[in-house]
C-alpha cells in the first residue's frame, strides 16, 4: 500500500493528459482513464466485459495475456476517439511484465504516447 501512495503522489493526470490506472486480479484486469484534477473516471474497460463478448460468440479460448492486449487496444481506440494522444501510465505498483506489459503494448499500438 505504501508503494501505491508514493507512486500516486508523483503521477497526476488532467484532461489533456489523463492517467490510465490498472488493477490486476488473479482472473481479470481492469483499466480506467482518470482525470485527477476533477476526480472523474472518464473511461473504463475490463477483461470481464470482453470475456462475455467472446463467450457469446463461442470463439476459441483466449489467454489472459492476449485478453490484456485486446483491452489495451480497445481502450486506446476509445481514448483516441476523444482526441487524446498522450497519457500517463499508472501501473499501480505492479511489475511491468506479463499482463501489464501486454496492456501497455496494446495502448502503444493504437498510437498513444506515455
Curated annotation (Swiss-Prot):
Q: Which GO terms describe its biological process?
A: translation
Ribonucleoprotein as UniProt keyword: yes
Gene Ontology cellular component list: cytoplasm; ribonucleoprotein complex; ribosome
User: What protein family does this chain belong to?
Assistant: Belongs to the universal ribosomal protein uL18 family.
Summarize subunit and interaction data from the UniProt record for this chain.
Answer: Part of the 50S ribosomal subunit; part of the 5S rRNA/L5/L18/L25 subcomplex. Contacts the 5S and 23S rRNAs.
Q: Which domain of life is it from?
A: Bacteria
Q: Gene3D superfamilies annotated for this entry? A: 3.30.420.100
Q: Check the record and name the Pfam families matching this protein.
A: Ribosomal_L18p
Q: Which InterPro entries match?
A: Ribosomal_uL18_bac-type, Ribosomal_uL18_bac/euk
**Official protein name in the record:** Large ribosomal subunit protein uL18
User: Could you tell me one molecular function GO term of this UniProt entry?
Assistant: 5S rRNA binding
Amino acid at each position: 500500500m505504501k508503494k501505491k501512495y508514493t507512486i500516486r503522489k508523483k503521477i497526476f493526470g488532467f484532461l489533456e493528459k489523463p492517467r490510465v490506472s490498472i488493477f490486476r486480479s488473479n482472473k481479470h484486469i481492469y483499466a480506467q482513464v482518470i482525470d485527477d484534477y476533477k476526480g472523474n473516471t472518464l473511461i473504463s474497460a475490463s477483461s470481464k466485459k470482453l470475456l462475455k463478448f467472446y463467450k457469446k460468440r463461442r470463439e476459441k479460448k483466449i489467454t489472459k495475456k492476449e485478453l490484456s492486449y485486446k483491452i489495451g487496444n480497445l481502450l486506446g481506440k476509445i481514448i483516441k476517439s476523444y482526441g487524446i494522444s498522450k497519457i500517463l501510465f499508472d501501473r499501480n505498483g505492479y511489475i511491468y511484465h506479463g499482463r501489464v506489459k501486454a496492456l501497455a503494448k496494446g495502448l502503444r499500438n493504437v498510437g498513444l504516447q506515455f
